[in-house]
Amino acid sequence: MDKKTSRLRRATRARKKIQELGVNRLVVHRTPRHTYAQVISPANVVLAAASTAEKAVSEQLKYTGNVDAAKAVGKTVAERAIEKGVAVVAFDRSGFKYHGRVAALADAAREAGLKF
């Protein structure tokens, strides 16, 4: 089993557990160049989203694939979710280690007011 398959299996297990709970989830995806975050309802409707691929976020940054960029995405997605009335979410790390950019995004979202 390769690295990607292992990550996807971990992600599937976590998503099934969050689905059983029936709460909104903050989903994180990362690539070498960008970081993406979405708040998704139990009915699989995207309520809020932010990424370093967006001009509004990326023009504040020097480089989009680092911890500082992830912090900016976390803060932005939290602000947008709170505007929509979502304050409590479950954190879905998509099988990625809770380290580096993923942890930075989570911490920034918490500081901006999301609870998880």
Curated annotation (Swiss-Prot):
One Pfam short name: Ribosomal_L18p
Entry keywords, A to Z: Ribonucleoprotein, Ribosomal protein, RNA-binding, rRNA-binding
Bridged cysteine pairs (disulfide): none
CDD domains, A to Z: Ribosomal_L18_L5e (cd00432)
InterPro entries: Ribosomal_uL18_bac-type, Ribosomal_uL18_bac/euk
Transcription regulation in keyword set: no
One GO CC term on file: cytosolic large ribosomal subunit
Single biological process term from Gene Ontology: translation
Keyword Repeat among record annotations: no
Transmembrane regions: none
Molecular function GO terms recorded: 5S rRNA binding; structural constituent of ribosome
Purpose: This is one of the proteins that bind and probably mediate the attachment of the 5S RNA into the large ribosomal subunit, where it forms part of the central protuberance.
Complexes and interactors: Part of the 50S ribosomal subunit; part of the 5S rRNA/L5/L18/L25 subcomplex. Contacts the 5S and 23S rRNAs.
Family recorded in the similarity comment: Belongs to the universal ribosomal protein uL18 family.
Xref: HAMAP family: Ribosomal_uL18_B
Protein name: Large ribosomal subunit protein uL18
Lineage, uppermost ranks: Bacteria, Pseudomonadati, Pseudomonadota, Gammaproteobacteria, Alteromonadales
Gene coding for it: rplR
